[in-house]
Amino acid sequence: MAKLETLKAALEKVLGKRVQKLIEATGELTLIVKADDYLEVARTLRDDPSLRFEQLIDLCGVDYSDFGDGAWDGLRFAAVSHLLSVTHNWRLRLRVFAPDDDFPVVPSLIDVWNSVNWFEREAFDFYGIVFEGHPDLRRLLTDYGFVGHPFRKDFPVSGYVEMRYDPEQKRVIYQPVTIEPREITPRVIREENYGGTQH
């Protein structure tokens, strides 16, 4: 725990007012910054000798629209980076919220850590978060003509289109989803001696 306290003090000293929030939970530290400060903070985290986060291990998108059983009233989309300082043996989670829920845009970190390239593409593909300044921001895992962003909470579980092989056309075709939603009621069997106990 002393290591986390040392890191927390170093972050507060070096970043000052650019720290929007610093959360310590379950033995981990999360730094939240504003989108306007995101790129500058990332460079500082990498270059400052007292921090030296040389590696970005992962970046993912998050949709907070139903977070906390729908009680969330903050911004909807966030990009969350996981950083590693080999020099100091520290780990840090860096979170930035996109200021616009309708068109989420945050700066790209590709000029700071080039390992973020495909991680940002994945977050764009699945959540629709645009990383401004990314040299090749295109879909990574979904199909070329895919409509929407499948990890958003408002995306239908069954999707919008399905593909199947058409024997008449002898090729794979796309068509609107034909899955009919149905209600499944579980069958409950009651036993007199449930669990082997006598009443």
Swiss-Prot record:
Under catalytic activity, the entry for this protein gives:
a quinone + NADH + 5 H(+)(in) = a quinol + NAD(+) + 4 H(+)(out)
Annotated GO molecular function terms are:
NADH dehydrogenase (ubiquinone) activity; NADH:ubiquinone reductase (non-electrogenic) activity; quinone binding
Task: Say which enzyme class the record assigns.
Answer: translocase
Where does the UniProt annotation locate this protein?
Cell inner membrane
According to the lineage, what is the superkingdom?
Bacteria
- SUPFAM superfamilies documented for this protein: Nqo5-like (SSF143243)
Q: Which UniProt keywords apply?
A: Cell inner membrane, Cell membrane, Membrane, NAD, Quinone, Translocase, Transport, Ubiquinone
Q: Choose one Gene Ontology CC annotation of this protein and give it.
A: plasma membrane
Q: Which PROSITE patterns match?
A: COMPLEX1_30K
Q: Name one Pfam family in it.
A: Complex1_30kDa
Might you give the EC number(s) for this enzyme? Answer: 7.1.1.-
**Topology in the membrane?**
Peripheral membrane protein
Function description: NDH-1 shuttles electrons from NADH, via FMN and iron-sulfur (Fe-S) centers, to quinones in the respiratory chain. The immediate electron acceptor for the enzyme in this species is believed to be ubiquinone. Couples the redox reaction to proton translocation (for every two electrons transferred, four hydrogen ions are translocated across the cytoplasmic membrane), and thus conserves the redox energy in a proton gradient.
Similarity remark: Belongs to the complex I 30 kDa subunit family.
Task: Give the record's subunit note.
Answer: NDH-1 is composed of 14 different subunits. Subunits NuoB, C, D, E, F, and G constitute the peripheral sector of the complex.
Write the protein's name: NADH-quinone oxidoreductase subunit C
Protein's organism: Cupriavidus pinatubonensis (strain JMP 134 / LMG 1197) (Cupriavidus necator (strain JMP 134))
